[in-house]
Amino acid sequence: IYGTREKLATFFNCPRPDHVVFTANSTEALNMAICGLLNPGDHVIATDLEHNSVLRPLYRLEAERSVSLSFVPADRQGRIDYGKFERLIRPETRAIICTHASNLTGNAVDIGRVGAIAHAHGLIFLVDASQTAGVLPIDMEAQQIDLLCFTGHKSLMGPQGTGGLCLREGITLRPWKVGGTGVQT
């Protein structure tokens, strides 16, 4: 298992193999990242290209934790106005969450450009690579990605029921599942 972590860390240029977390699928990885990251009163920017695996946890946190949401619209051809990200940033903005490519249109987002915007403003950048992991190049360091969520069963050629989350150094998430051994570890 650790060998697979090492391969994924190398493939995505994730700084450390022990920062690769295995999940049942991308939906679980996205829920773990989104729910583990956001706090009451945080503001998040996403696009209107997002999959329900991003939208539903965001809407839930909007209702339960008073997380506020803004969306960068795509035009009729599915293209993003990248300047809109900066125009939506507020003092309470915590993160930008962005799909790498739409599952409906196939349009790809320049995640390197969005990552640069996020980091220029001290924001966390979370990428949903469910459609692109194994298809388009993804480099967490070069594209300034803090959290990368992916599924294993599509272009990574893994079995159904596999996915993962890669975290940049210094990113911590609130646990969303608890239980187990009874020994504090």
Language-model features: where?
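Pyridoxal 5′-phosphate
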Residues: 1-185
